[in-house]
């Protein structure tokens, strides 16, 4: 690579990823983007879990109308900051049915640490489950919804959380019966740095 180009790009990369510095860990990037890098093939089920003590911080997907109007998926995880502690329990949430819109957050104030999905040829759509982890008795606050991903049905999707102190707690999706595709809005929340008494927020 030309050294001039490297010196131009290096400060940009440093600024973009420097926001993760408070974690005290390096950012665990996506798997390889090649065909072998996706967690699933089209029309195939999958189960993806972050390593213990990490949560999902990025979601990438491409749509293929010829392959059952399905998507291939890729995720990136990052360790939670030491102030949050270790996860005290993890579980799979209830299934969100294929062919329907849905809204779900992790119960018990959990954070999203994985996804599980199965494809249904009959509706050209997937059912979804979140893998959630709870961190002691920490509670979410200052929650908000991201913009829609993808921006339009059928487009590539690339969501990265650049706010290091916000965590994914769930999502809401629309479903187009015409396009056989979904748009996602992810639910992002901050977490208290102390234990609280709320069972679920």
Curated annotation (Swiss-Prot):
Modification after translation (UniProt): Sulfated on tyrosine residue(s).
Span of the signal peptide: 1-18
Disulfide bonds listed in the record: 50-77, 90-132, 106-133, 139-196, 143-189
Region annotation (3 X 6 AA tandem repeats of D-R-[EQ]-W-[NQK]-[FY]) ranges: 70-186
One cellular component term from this protein's GO annotations in UniProt: extracellular region
Domain of life: Eukaryota
Region (2 X 53-55 AA tandem repeats): 26-135
Record PANTHER family: DERMATOPONTIN, DERMATOPONTIN-RELATED
Record text on subunit structure and interactions: Interacts with TGFB1, DCN and collagen.
Purpose: Seems to mediate adhesion by cell surface integrin binding. May serve as a communication link between the dermal fibroblast cell surface and its extracellular matrix environment. Enhances TGFB1 activity. Inhibits cell proliferation. Accelerates collagen fibril formation, and stabilizes collagen fibrils against low-temperature dissociation.
The protein's name in its UniProt record: Dermatopontin
The organism of origin for this protein: Bos taurus (Bovine)
Lineage, opening ranks: Eukaryota, Metazoa, Chordata, Craniata, Vertebrata
